[in-house]
């Protein structure tokens, strides 16, 4: 799939002085997809779930590849100002480097093929935008999103549903490795999904819960993290389902390019993480790479390495990890080694890193009151 497949998703107004293009939304063309019974909806949900499970297994989440390409094109451009280059850059979407945007667009394509079996599905599916780390939920949901104060850093697939007169929304979120259909009913009754455990790692268990709010225009997504010492933290995100999102490439994919974390994640059909590579970008010093993988016995192994060590690749321990990770990520060893070496060159370019983090700061400032 290429960006050109999605005409109209890359263009958005970009006011001078604003760090991102303004997000744009469309209008729904019809009513929610109607089901005479819960059983008929369950038939659809089973088909949707199979599709999302196949997708998360077949495609890695990869925000490293698109970032490396962005850096190389910036260097080749001869530009000195990253912000100027960023404003004119059109982020391509390729299946080797899918983030939440590419995964959601790919899933939309696949699900629309089910329209013969479930008439109205193709026209009912839409992209929903999501704002993360919300401090004041009540204030946020009292209005439609303000284009100038949101960053819309995440997208997912949604479908409005009507089950015997009961309204709700079905969500599919391959970008966050959710390999199931999340059903959110207004009355919170079956088939409402409720809370479920998304991941259970030795250091932390993540539980997700979803509920409709804001007169049905928003889904409140709560991420509850329980540490092994008993400490619990709950994060709130808001998914806007009031209108279909029309700028996933121009806004969300572009925003992802300057985020201060890079990751490459392999998943199984249940959304379990088979391998992860994560790099948080500090303002100074050598970034740390955190890697983990599932062993054949189901045990989770985890290590940390300085990013610069991926340039020479002389450490036998790193070579061993690259080989194991490449297998879990369904990549060739040389491909993964080159990708990590390229990432190291990009992030050890201190002028580039400083400009990158400055853009990220500007975006965070715009959305700081959400």
What role is predicted for each listed range?
Residues 61-64, 98-108, 154-157, 171-176:
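Long, contiguous hydrophobic alpha-helical segments, chiefly transmembrane helices and signal peptides
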Residues 4-96:
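Secondary-structure boundary elements
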Residues 237-370:
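Extended, charged low-complexity segments
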Residues 24, 29-32, 41, 45-56, ...:
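Hydrophobic, Leu/Ile/Phe/Ala-enriched alpha-helical segments that form helix-helix packing faces
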Residues 75-148, 152:
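Active-site neighborhood of thiol-dependent amide/isopeptide-bond enzymes
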Residues 127-288:
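His-Asp-centered catalytic microenvironments across diverse enzyme cores
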Residues 115, 159-163, 295-297:
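Short acidic, glycine-rich loop/turn motifs
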